[in-house]
A protein has these predicted regions:
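Conserved PDZ fold ligand-binding element
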Residues: 140-162, 229
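PDZ-domain C-terminal substructure recognizer with occasional recognition of PDZ-binding tails
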Residues: 146, 152-153, 167-209
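Alpha-helical transmembrane signal-anchor/signal-peptide segments
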Residues: 39-44, 124-141
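N-terminal amphipathic/basic-hydrophobic helices that include classical n-h-c signal peptides
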Residues: 1-11
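Internal alpha-helical transmembrane segments
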Residues: 62-65, 69-133, 340
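Functional transmembrane alpha-helices
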Residues: 93, 194-293, 310-333, 348-354
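Small-residue-rich helix-interface/hinge motifs
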Residues: 13-86, 296-304, 309-318
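Alpha-helical transmembrane segments of multi-pass membrane proteins
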Residues: 21-25, 76, 109, 113, ...
Length: 354
């Protein structure tokens, strides 16, 4: 079968990726925008994208813009990085209002992820961590685990999805795995040593999933939608820890170009199964990317929402703001470093593609 992608399909995939990026960024910035307005802060410009404007319209006090590079967005608030306390400025708003305004962006990303998760869980169901069988010759077969066991914990950590086992094995590269399972309403604890599988180039213990189970109770759908978002957030945090420990190579890091390529691959692989499967697959990407953006923006780094929250929390502790000009310089330096990192990641993405 010829799996080559036509130029027309590539262009369509890029458009789809840009729409997904746009929606996620729009929701994030709208969170900032809404709470800025509620806190009495004047929003100078609300934009999707970066770089020069390609379209804009001026409202009563806010300019709404679409910019050339679809790599981010902004909600520029009056006096945000300046020593400015005039009415309507960011610094003139109550401290709690400023904290809510900054935190709202990531929170709105988590809300978007939850809404998308409802759609996915309602239509696909959940992969409950119930063992349906074993792979011959792999450790789980002789470990004492049994068909029908429901895995509740991995090394003391609660799990709710079968895929959590694979995630843990990848993150811990061959370390012993202690499973707490429920069997006939009793709990058993069993330790298994993973075995490296040359064919799949990964560590495995050799258990088989019972597949996805459709949920009939709407409250169960809501419960597992929350757990889906929680799992995605935890996976993002674990991946960051994995990266900081030096376990990931630079070639494994993806940025916007790599994500566009990944979205294109998702569309192409799901297209033969119909438009609804394509929609479900893209919804998975929106869930993953929106939760990722929420987590990444909460990192305590200059220029990110997390870095700005640190300064606001320090203001709450010391009951006075730190030097705002210094804070502005710190955020500017952080932004410059983030741009350098983005260029590196984009170069890395392009190198992998070509």
């Amino acid at each position: 079968m010829d799996r080559r992608v036509s130029g027309k399909d590539k262009n369509l995939n890029i458009v789809i990726a840009l729409i997904i990026f746009g929606i996620i960024v729009l929701i994030h910035e709208f969170g900032h925008f809404l709470f800025a307005k509620l806190s009495g802060v004047k929003v100078v410009e609300f934009s999707v994208g970066m770089g020069p404007r390609i379209f804009s319209v001026k409202g009563k006090e806010t300019r709404y813009s679409l910019k050339l590079l679809p790599l981010g967005g902004s909600c520029a608030m009056y006096g945000e990085d300046e020593d400015e306390d005039a009415p309507g400025s960011f610094n003139s708003a109550p401290l709690l209002g400023r904290i809510a305004t900054i935190a709202a962006g990531p929170v709105f990303n988590f809300i978007l992820a939850f809404l998308v998760a409802i759609f996915i869980v309602a239509n696909v169901g959940v992969d409950k961590p119930v063992i349906s069988g074993f792979v011959s010759g792999l450790p789980a077969e002789s470990s004492g685990l049994m068909v029908g066991d429901e895995i509740e914990k991995i090394n003391g950590r609660d799990i709710f999805f079968y895929r959590s086992v694979s995630t843990y094995l990848f993150m811990n590269q061959g370390k012993d795995i202690t499973l707490t399972v429920k069997r006939n309403n009793e709990k058993q604890t069993i330790t298994v040593t993973p075995m490296y599988n040359e064919e799949y180039s990964q560590y495995m213990i050799g258990i088989k999933s019972s597949g996805y189970e459709k949920l009939k109770n709407p409250f169960s759908v809501l419960k597992y939608s929350v757990l889906e978002v929680k799992y995605t957030i935890s996976m993002t945090v674990d991946s960051l820890i994995y990266l900081l420990r030096g376990r990931a190579r630079a070639s494994e890091i993806s940025g916007p170009v790599g994500i566009v390529n990944m979205i294109g691959t998702t569309v192409n692989e799901s297209k033969p199964y119909g438009i609804f499967v394509v929609l479900l697959s893209l919804s998975q990407m929106v869930l993953l990317l929106s939760a990722n953006l929420g987590v990444m923006n909460l990192l305590p780094l200059p220029a990110l929402d997390g870095g700005r929250l640190i300064f606001l929390f320090l203001e709450a502790i010391f009951r006075r703001p730190l030097n705002r000009k210094v804070e502005g310089y710190i955020h500017f330096a952080g932004f410059a470093l983030l741009m350098i990192l983005m260029v590196f990641v984009m170069f890395n993405d392009i190198r992998k593609i070509i």
